[in-house]
């Protein structure tokens, strides 16, 4: 009786694991360079979150469907190349946010294809014992958890650092220009953890 109840609770909580309890940035410590460096503006955070979701979900689904048939030494290379192709194809999706956002993200756009979050989830679902539905649920919830933390950090840093949110001046009680530097991103991330 108790085991069935535990399984039912775990099945329901899987939808929220990546958001709160097993957040990839706060709890897992994955993708910290993105959370620290890119979160100086909300446009950058939304853009990188869109690109991560567009690459993470199909790549983890590929790993769950074909991972058991791939050699263990070649699978991470294939996942990285597949993710990079998806990211390059999805860059036009972020250009309507702001024309200069692709330039401001710089090297972090191609680095999305080799981040720890992607390779960890692909490795987890590469064996044939796990169902692709669980891979899809985890990829979506981890993408949403990543986006939530990225946008929260960016909102705090942009508002308190410049008094602007998404290019619109918003009255802030005070502005601290030092909150825009990378070191402060580490401190804010630690406070949220």
PLM features: what roles do these ranges have?
Residues 42-58, 78, 102-113:
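Structural signature of hydrophobic alpha-helical transmembrane segments
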Residues 64-78, 98-103, 166-176:
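Membrane interface segments of multi-pass transport proteins and intramembrane proteases
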Residues 31-36, 52-53, 57, 84-92, ...:
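Hydrophobic core segments of alpha-helical transmembrane domains in multi-pass membrane transport
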Residues 13, 132-193:
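C-terminal transmembrane helix-loop-helix hairpin of multi-pass membrane proteins
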Residues 71-83, 104-110, 138:
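Cytoplasmic-side transmembrane-helix entry/capping segments in multi-pass membrane proteins
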Residues 59-72, 119-130:
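C-terminal ends of transmembrane helices
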Residues 92-142:
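Membrane-proximal helix-loop-helix units in multi-pass membrane proteins
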Residues 1-16:
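Intrinsically disordered, low-complexity non-transmembrane regions of multi-pass membrane transporters
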């Amino acid at each position: 009786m108790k085991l069935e109840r535990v399984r039912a609770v775990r099945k329901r909580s899987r939808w929220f694991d990546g958001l709160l309890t097993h957040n990839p940035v706060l709890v897992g410590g994955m993708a910290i360079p993105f959370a620290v460096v890119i979160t100086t503006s909300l446009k950058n955070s939304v853009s990188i979150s869109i690109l991560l979701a567009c690459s993470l979900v199909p790549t983890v689904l590929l790993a769950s469907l074909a991972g058991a048939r791939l050699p263990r030494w070649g699978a991470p290379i294939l996942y990285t190349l597949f993710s990079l192709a998806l990211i390059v194809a999805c860059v036009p999706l972020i250009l309507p946010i702001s024309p200069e956002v692709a330039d401001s993200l710089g090297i972090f756009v191609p680095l999305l294809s080799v981040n720890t979050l992607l390779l960890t989830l692909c490795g987890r679902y590469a064996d044939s014992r796990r169902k692709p539905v669980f891979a899809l649920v985890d990829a979506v919830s981890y993408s949403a958890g990543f986006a939530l933390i990225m946008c929260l950090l960016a909102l705090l840093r942009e508002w308190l650092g410049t008094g602007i949110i998404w290019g619109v001046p918003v009255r802030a009680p005070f502005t601290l220009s030092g909150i825009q530097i990378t070191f402060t991103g580490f401190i804010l991330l630690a406070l949220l953890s």
